[in-house]
A protein has these predicted regions:
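A short, basic N-terminal segment
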Residues: 1-48
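Mid-core helix/loop region of P-loop NTP-binding domains shared across ATPases and GTPases
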Residues: 3-17, 65, 71, 83-194, ...
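Walker A/P-loop nucleotide-binding motif
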Residues: 45-67
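Conserved catalytic segments around the Walker B and adjacent sensor/switch elements
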Residues: 50-52, 72-84
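Conserved C-terminal helix/linker of AAA+ ATPases
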Residues: 237-260
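Short alpha-helical segments that sit at the start of domains
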Residues: 255-278
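Short amphipathic alpha-helical interface segments
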Residues: 271-295
Length: 337
């Protein structure tokens, strides 16, 4: 349910929200056409190529996929956010619910897979697993292997590079046979186009000048979600001071608020070990990988092994919380946000 809000500057807050269906998919024509090409056979009940959609946060991955599925594949597609549904059972229940079946508590995972198999025998279906890296590690191979075994078409969405899949069982990787499609960060001019489009829908005419849209875009780090949050914050801040239009001071305060909120949301995606590692790094801002791992091991009795630590750091870099400089034993990690 959308929050009801109407002010002298913002007349409709919905276009500034993440869930708002876009009126136009800006600067993603290539990705849209490529995805449509690989999904189109499903409309004729033919198999599709499994897709791996990747790129930094706020680059339009989820927005574009949901738009395509809802507009062209509504009857045969299920979308699952794996940050909310992390286990095999939760994912299967969510998929089956989409196709009209409510799972019983007494049913085992094997029963749910059989029920899904009954559906796939009647029609070719597509399942999108958004934030696929958030699936519980012990369940990841099970759910992916068995879904492919049922001839389900899969769309996997992640912030992380395709190399994250190296942690899967080789048999699962081979079965998936994924085609990778990258969503790079938006360029400044692309963010400005998106910002102006949403500005025209959300703000009273003349209250959010083009120059302020550009300023917000310059501080958005290629992230359209961050841009919209900055614009929303700026509009509300301007209204709070009874201004007639958004000015530089409103945008800059909006930037600070938006980045604080983004950081808190990203930290929610970390497990307890990752949060400890991040906290250690945050204190020094920059640490050699070896020193960071040793400090973590001293603080945590049941610490993870070096290989898992590297995977955790890879994940935090993919989220944009940290960045890695250098390779192997010379690697240094830095805090980004």
């Amino acid at each position: 349910m959308h929050e009801e809000y109407e002010g002298v500057i913002i007349h409709n807050v919905e276009p500034l929200e993440e869930a708002f269906p876009p009126t136009r998919l800006w600067h993603r024509d290539g990705q849209r056409d490529e995805i449509a090409f690989y999904l189109k056979p499903a409309l004729k009940n033919r198999p599709i190529r499994n897709l791996y959609i990747y790129g930094p946060p706020g680059t339009g991955k989820t927005c574009l996929i949901k738009w395509i599925l809802e507009n062209y594949f509504e009857e045969i597609a299920a979308y699952v956010n794996c940050f909310r549904f992390r286990t095999t059972r939760e994912i299967l229940k969510e998929v089956l619910f989409k196709f009209g079946y409510i799972a019983k508590e007494s049913e085992q995972n094997s029963d749910l897979f059989k029920k899904l198999e009954e559906i796939t025998k009647k029609k070719r279906i597509i399942i999108c697993l958004d934030e696929v890296d958030q699936i519980k590690e012990s369940d990841k191979d099970e759910v992916l292997y068995n879904l492919v075994d049922l001839r389900v078409g899969l769309i996997l969405i992640s912030n992380r590079l395709p190399t994250q899949l190296y942690t899967l069982d080789p048999r699962t990787r081979d079965r998936l046979n994924l085609h990778d499609i990258e969503f790079p960060e938006y360029k400044l001019n692309e963010l400005i186009d998106i910002g102006i489009d949403r500005r025209n829908l959300a703000f009273v005419p003349g209250t959010f000048p083009d120059s302020m849209v550009q300023l917000a875009a310059e501080h958005s780090e290629g992230d359209a979600r961050l841009l919209l949050l900055i614009m929303r914050n700026a509009g509300r801040i301007a209204e709070q001071r009874n201004a007639k239009k958004v000015e530089e001071q409103d945008v800059m305060k909006g930037v600070l608020e938006a980045k604080r909120l983004r950081k808190s949301k990203l930290l929610e995606k970390l497990n307890e070990h990752q949060k400890i590692i991040y906290s250690i790094l945050e204190q020094k801002r920059r640490m050699p990988a070896g020193e960071l791992f040793r400090t973590y091991c001293k603080q945590v009795k049941n610490h993870v092994e070096a290989r898992t630590f590297r995977l955790y750091m890879f994940h935090m870099c993919a989220l944009g919380l940290t960045k890695a400089i250098g390779a192997k034993k010379w690697r240094v990690y830095e805090i980004v946000i």
